[in-house]
A protein has these predicted regions:
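Conserved non-catalytic scaffold segment of RNase H-like nuclease domains
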Residues: 1-107, 120-136
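Short, flexible loop segments at boundaries between secondary-structure elements
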Residues: 112-121
Length: 136
C-alpha cells in the first residue's frame, strides 16, 4: 500500500499551489512507519500570478521565495499512490489536480473529518488547536 500525508499551500484561497509537501508512509501489521529520507517539500512558481496578502499571512511564503522555482504544473505524485491523508484533504486534492494530477483512483482520508467525529465537542478542529487539546 502506498499512502502519503499531503499538505499544500496556495497563492490565494482555492488558488494555485506554491508549496506541496508529502511524507510517504507504510502501514503494516497495524504499525505506521515513515522514512524521513523520502519526505518531499517543494516550492513552485505560478507564472505572473501574485500571492495574496491573506495567503502570505497564513503560510508566510513571499513572492521572492518562489522565483526560479519549478512551475507548479511539473508536480507529480509518487507512482502507486493509493491513499492521500491530510487535514481538510479535499482542498489539497483539488490543489494538486490543478497540476494535472488524476485523483480519480485515489482514496482520501480526511483527518479533519476524523477529528470532528472523535471530538465533536472540541472548541476547534484545526491542527494547532487539536495539538494543544490532545497534549494536555
Amino acid at each position: 500500500m502506498q499512502a502519503i500525508i499531503l499538505d499544500t499551500e496556495t497563492h490565494s484561497l482555492n488558488g494555485l499551489p506554491i508549496e506541496i509537501a508529502y511524507a510517504p508512509i507504510q502501514i503494516q501489521a497495524g504499525k505506521l512507519t515513515l522514512d524521513k529520507s523520502q519526505i518531499f517539500d517543494q516550492l513552485y512558481s505560478i507564472g505572473d500570478e501574485k500571492i495574496s496578502y491573506g495567503a502570505m499571512a497564513v503560510h508566510h511564503i513571499l513572492e521572492q521565495d518562489i522565483v526560479d522555482q519549478p512551475h507548479f504544473d511539473t508536480f507529480q505524485l509518487p507512482s502507486e499512490t493509493f491513499y492521500i491523508i491530510g487535514h481538510n484533504i479535499d482542498y489539497d486534492i483539488r490543489t494538486i489536480e490543478k497540476c494535472g494530477v488524476d485523483s480519480s483512483k485515489i482514496k482520501a482520508i480526511c483527518t479533519l473529518a476524523l477529528a470532528r467525529r472523535a471530538w465533536p465537542d472540541a472548541e476547534a478542529h484545526n491542527i494547532s488547536a487539536l495539538i494543544y487539546m490532545i497534549s494536555k
